[in-house]
């Protein structure tokens, strides 16, 4: 087979003087992983690091001799920045064939080399790794030599290391001596067969990138043409390939589907040292990605991210070591999942740390301005950082973990927003209450009982509407500035809930203002009506309720038109609600008037007695009536009583409507005693709520009035009888008095002292007569005589001699004496 010459050259990305966003993200991630908590400080050996020891143990932890592979890579930030922009090269060959020496010359590594003085035992144990190049863009693997005496016939380890190198290396060098070409074992052809078989295993589930196998012929002999050596090796390769039993999927597949081959040779290291060094330097150029003839073509790159190399190598080796089927796609997926998860966790932690300031702000009860902008920026930064660091991993896994990371970040931000929303809701509620209260306090100053103008309330109604609109606008703005896009749907209910609360507070404020306006109107109307109806209540005339109704109707017509206008302009009430409120207000005002009437119940006995006296005991001029024998006491008495009862009847019922005048609550006394059922009975059709005097109160008042009426009537009859006696003195008696008393009359006239005394006594009697005080004088004289007689008898009763006689003619009766005395005193009054 002809030599495979490179058709493309692979150009690595140059390091720029300024860091790209991806470089910054990786640097940030590296710094986080290099923190004292994540890195164990172990001295980095100059000879590279043994990643797999001779017993097959992977360098997963730090030891005294070497760091773990992870920490070794983390100590190379330049390499970490490469992402997938690096190449891996490994070398296979017999033990002590100069593999490590060749690598040191090619890549400026410092792998330990053979010291022949110490013997030709194996120098490289297991697998060693080092970074090469000024930009650390080449990973060099030095594998333990094959066919060593230490392993004897145990080929399992070299098989495992070969499979490991195939999994991670873009270029695999096979180091063999020229004089071993043609020998199956010595030329590592048996190892090549293993490589071919293992590589087919790697291709079973998914085609992996090709591997370039470079045969390095050592100790070239001048008399053997190199082309012949190349043909011999290719013939051996084809025989080996034909002997390999491929999976069914790859039957009849050519070898160049899986491998590319190149050949080179070097002179003897010791005999032709200068030539060896010169040709090695020429060969070194082919390991420069910038060279057009480079070995590192893109199709050979295994696409393992630099920051995931340690994890990938460990997973690959553990799988190989456990003799499990190696599934590179699964391993890459596992690596991607592991690294993406690790990066995701680190970014989540950084995100959590970055918003601690906002957490403290919210914890203190302070709202974060532009919450949405801040959180969106933090989330975008975190996701961008995640994408930058994970861009070389499997896209499906990166996207899957990215979604998980977003959910974590969104969950954290959502918990912060819940607190933010709680504080905003509390603040907006406080603002609504405060501003509406200020407006309410302002229109409360309008209160004046003597004046009611609903137009003044309209200003504050408009102010409430304007304030509500401003608060709703500010709430929407604040909410929009606080709600991240991913929470928009979830928070609609919260937004609408607060808007609803604002509306409820506004309706409550309007309702309270309408209530204040209604109360203002009620007080105004009360203060207007009271002075106008009080005189009617005091006058106690038959047309009292008619006059009161006229006042109420007049005031209601004017007043409630104003109130209705106020409701229309200052509230959001509809027509039916306004009518209902007007109706309630009328009822309230009528109840106030009713209470005013009820309060006068205490004065009712005085008003009724005054009414009776004004008709019965005083004449039309308001002077005390002088009863003459011709006066009709009975007719006047019944007239006074009936009119007094009419007044009582007016106060029994709240006659605010015209048809209320038909109800009667008192009865005529002329038919005898008052039956109790006539008082307790409620007139048919009467409204119990309009009752002012209940049946018990009416009963007590009627009984009291009955006594008052009877006393007045008896006094009038007595005075009339006295006047009749005065007019019944016979004429002959007057003539006899003059005839027999003529001498005494002359004696009085001739005696100045008796004359003056007679004038005084006569004048007093005349005045008493003119003033109709005869009855009073009579009663008083009777009272004095009675008291004198009673005192005399009681005194004689104390003398034992007269006691029996006095007891017979003057029995002792204290109650009678008291009653007669009381009656005499009453008549005297």
From Swiss-Prot:
Domain of life assignment: Eukaryota
GO cellular component, one term: endoplasmic reticulum membrane
Species of the source: Entamoeba dispar (strain ATCC PRA-260 / SAW760)
Membrane topology designation: Multi-pass membrane protein
GO annotation terms (biological process): endoplasmic reticulum membrane fusion
Physiological role: Probable GTP-binding protein that may be involved in cell development.
HAMAP family registered for this protein in UniProt: Sey1
Protein name (Swiss-Prot/TrEMBL): Protein SEY1 homolog 2
Disordered: annotated segments: 1-21
EC number in record: 3.6.5.-
Classification via Gene3D superfamilies: P-loop containing nucleotide triphosphate hydrolases
One protein family per Pfam: Sey1_3HB
Ranges of residues in domain GB1/RHD3-type G: 83-305
Keyword list, A-Z: Coiled coil, Endoplasmic reticulum, GTP-binding, Hydrolase, Membrane, Nucleotide-binding, Transmembrane, Transmembrane helix
Keyword Phosphoprotein: no
Positions on the Cytoplasmic side per record topology: 1-728, 774-829
GO MF term set: GTP binding; GTPase activity
């Amino acid at each position: 087979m002809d030599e495979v010459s490179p058709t493309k050259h692979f150009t690595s990305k140059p390091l720029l003087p300024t860091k790209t966003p991806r470089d910054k993200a990786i640097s940030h991630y590296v710094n986080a992983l290099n923190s004292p908590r994540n890195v164990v400080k172990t001295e980095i050996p100059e000879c590279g690091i043994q990643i797999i020891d001779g017993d097959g143990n992977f360098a997963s932890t730090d030891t005294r001799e070497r760091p773990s592979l992870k920490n070794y890579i983390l100590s190379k930030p330049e390499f970490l920045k490469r992402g997938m922009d690096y190449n891996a090269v490994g070398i296979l060959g017999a033990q002590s064939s100069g593999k490590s020496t060749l690598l040191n010359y090619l890549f400026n590594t410092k792998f330990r080399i053979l010291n022949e003085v110490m013997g030709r035992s194996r120098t490289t144990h297991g697998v060693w790794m080092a970074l090469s190049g000024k930009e650390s863009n080449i990973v060099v693997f030095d594998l333990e030599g094959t066919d060593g005496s230490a392993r004897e016939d145990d080929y399992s380890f070299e098989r495992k290391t070969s499979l490991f190198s195939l999994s991670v290396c873009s270029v695999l060098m096979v180091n063999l001596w020229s004089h071993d070409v043609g020998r199956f074992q010595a030329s590592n052809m048996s190892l090549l067969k293993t490589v071919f078989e293992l590589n087919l295993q790697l291709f079973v589930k998914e085609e992996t990138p090709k591997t370039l196998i470079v045969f390095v012929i050592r100790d070239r002999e001048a008399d053997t043409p190199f082309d012949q050596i190349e043909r011999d090796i290719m013939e051996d390769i084809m025989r080996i390939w034909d002997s390999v039993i491929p999976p069914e999927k790859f039957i009849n597949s050519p070898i160049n589907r899986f491998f590319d081959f190149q050949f080179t040779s070097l002179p003897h290291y010791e005999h032709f040292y200068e030539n060896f060094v010169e040709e090695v330097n020429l060969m070194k150029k082919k390991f420069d990605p910038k060279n057009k003839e480079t070995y590192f073509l893109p199709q050979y790159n295994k696409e393992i991210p630099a920051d995931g190399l340690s994890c990938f190598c460990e997973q690959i080796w553990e799988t190989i070591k456990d003799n499990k089927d190696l599934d590179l796609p699964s391993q890459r997926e596992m690596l991607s999942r592991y690294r993406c998860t690790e990066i995701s966790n680190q970014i989540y932690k950084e995100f959590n740390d970055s918003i601690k300031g906002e957490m403290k702000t919210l914890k203190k009860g302070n709202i974060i301005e532009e919450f949405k902008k801040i959180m969106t920026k933090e989330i975008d930064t975190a996701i961008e950082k995640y994408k930058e660091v994970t861009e070389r991993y499997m896209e499906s896994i990166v996207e899957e973990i990215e979604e998980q990371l977003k959910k974590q970040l969104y969950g954290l931000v959502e918990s912060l927003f819940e607190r933010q929303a709680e504080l905003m809701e509390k603040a907006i509620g406080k603002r609504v209450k405060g501003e509406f209260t200020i407006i309410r306090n302002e229109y409360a100053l309008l209160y004046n009982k003597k004046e009611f103008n609903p137009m003044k309330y309209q200003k504050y109604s408009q102010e409430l509407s304007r304030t509500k609109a401003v608060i709703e606008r500010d709430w929407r703005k604040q909410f929009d500035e606080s709600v991240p896009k991913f929470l928009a749907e979830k928070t609609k209910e919260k937004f609408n809930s607060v808007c609803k609360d604002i509306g409820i507070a506004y309706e409550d404020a309007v309702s309270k203002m309408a209530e204040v306006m209604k109360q203002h109107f009620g007080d105004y109307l009360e203060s207007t009506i009271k002075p106008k109806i009080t005189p009617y209540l005091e006058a106690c005339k038959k047309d009292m309720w008619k006059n009161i109704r006229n006042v109420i109707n007049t005031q209601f017509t004017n007043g409630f038109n104003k109130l209705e206008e106020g409701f229309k302009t200052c509230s959001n009430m509809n027509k039916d609600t306004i009518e209902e409120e007007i109706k309630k207000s009328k009822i309230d005002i009528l109840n106030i008037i009713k209470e005013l009437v009820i309060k006068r119940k205490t004065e009712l006995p005085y008003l009724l007695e005054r009414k009776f006296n004004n008709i019965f005991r005083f004449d039309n001029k308001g002077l005390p009536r002088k009863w003459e024998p011709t006066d009709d006491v009975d007719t006047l008495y019944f007239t006074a009583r009936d009119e007094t009862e009419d007044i009582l009847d007016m106060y029994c019922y709240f006659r605010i409507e015209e048809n209320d005048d038909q109800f009667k609550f008192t009865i005529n006394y002329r038919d005898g005693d008052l039956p109790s059922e006539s008082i307790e009975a409620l007139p048919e059709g009467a409204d119990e709520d309009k009752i002012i005097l209940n049946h018990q109160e009416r009963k007590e008042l009627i009984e009291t009035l009955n006594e008052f009426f009877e006393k007045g009537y008896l006094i009038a009859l007595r005075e009339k009888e006295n006047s009749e006696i005065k007019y019944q003195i016979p004429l002959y008696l007057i003539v006899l008095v003059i005839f027999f008393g003529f001498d005494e009359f002359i004696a009085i006239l001739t005696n100045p002292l008796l004359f003056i005394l007679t004038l005084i006594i006569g004048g007093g009697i005349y005045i008493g007569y003119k003033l109709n005080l005869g009855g009073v004088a009579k009663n008083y004289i009777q009272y004095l005589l009675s008291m004198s007689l009673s005192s005399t008898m009681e005194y004689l009763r104390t003398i034992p001699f007269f006691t029996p006689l006095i007891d017979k003619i003057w029995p002792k009766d204290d109650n009678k004496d008291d009653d007669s005395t009381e009656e005499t005193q009453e008549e005297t009054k």
